[in-house]
């Protein structure tokens, strides 16, 4: 019926203008119902600029006579409608485009999203307790964790809470896997065995997706019940996932009154005529700035309701990366769409030699990697930014301190603030011994792969000097674990587990004093301290560590690998 009215209106300009006004009134009534910021979910108010939720109320434009029938057609079906301008008479298509209304957002979000200006104090952190208090007992939870940084952001306790039905949902899969089959099939088998053998959790409720490439979105939707809550750390991809699900299954944002009753009507045929503008109004606010979401926001997709919650922060008093890393570098690491997926296929490496003088490799000063003397190594970095070698760490810090402006010839290599570039601002992380390749993960930044080439010979331990406040872990290459483990499991018809069960595959680093010389001895001492309450996890307890690392083992020994879940 409504579709026929649109088509008939094109034959009569007067009717067309009438339909145009109806179309515009829908936007006005929709905006009248919106009492929350479309980006962060906070309640809006336009009375006190110094109070949370302040926004500048837009003034309604005045619509005059349109100049042509083509203008009206374009209005109704345009895929590129623009923002509102205040108090502007509309008499042409160009002016009409400029008056189309956008969802209301608070001034904080507007400045952050459109001007890249924000005060960290306005982006408060939430504990996991703060977030869980917003969820009714017995609810279905999807614990959202970015796959490329796993197991960072993973909270084991969420899968063990008895009064929630929790599934593990791994996002940003395109930053680790080359194809969607790894996410759809292989990862499901691997993580089922990983949870069982590494953590002692029996669960087959794991889904891996890529919201950016729409990989395996159907499995994520299938994992959702009538009411599902997305729970995860800040900036792990919850909003991007919601938007992908809404696009695929035609969802929309829901609003509630003060009594908690839904006041949003289902979209009509008219609403969906301009699908691009429709989704622009409905989408969850996606930002590279952590802690953008401040309140629960609901969405209806098919017959299911999905709730986006503020991201929690494990270390509520942790460092702010904005105080360490330059804004443009930080934006590159946080924006998912800026990740270069070609690196996953080409895997072009850089060779780095270790020497007695302390030759090192860095990406922006975000880390300095110092390989053992006498080794030749390959590194593939998936962290945005150009890498560079220096004679030693002190030389690298000296250069970056001098990079005060873009005029410096090496400015493009510097990603940290010059005032950070003092030795005392960096922490010495030592990697436990390994065979073959490993991946080093920097929390909320990215990961890179390193491999020592040539015949195996232990020549020392790899060191990473990282700014204080950035967490680091080491793992066996995750994509290889998933693919090879899944293959062995399939070939053995399920007799061989898809995940190793007799060795740890993830480990924390060992933070030692800058002057410590007996690294292996100190590592053993720290290993015993870490495992004092987890004695069953201890391995090679009575073996000579030098004897263990001196020979090549058929299976990785992963000496002193340990991660506290």
UniProtKB/Swiss-Prot annotation:
Any one GO molecular function term: GTP binding
Keyword Mitochondrion: yes
Entry coiled-coil feature ranges: none
Gene3D superfamilies, per database record: P-loop containing nucleotide triphosphate hydrolases
Matches recorded under PROSITE patterns: G_CP
GO cellular component terms, A-Z: mitochondrion
Keywords: Mitochondrion, Transit peptide
Role noted for this protein: May be involved in the mitochondrial lipid metabolism.
Name this protein carries in UniProt: Genetic interactor of prohibitins 3, mitochondrial
Protein species of origin: Zygosaccharomyces rouxii (strain ATCC 2623 / CBS 732 / NBRC 1130 / NCYC 568 / NRRL Y-229)
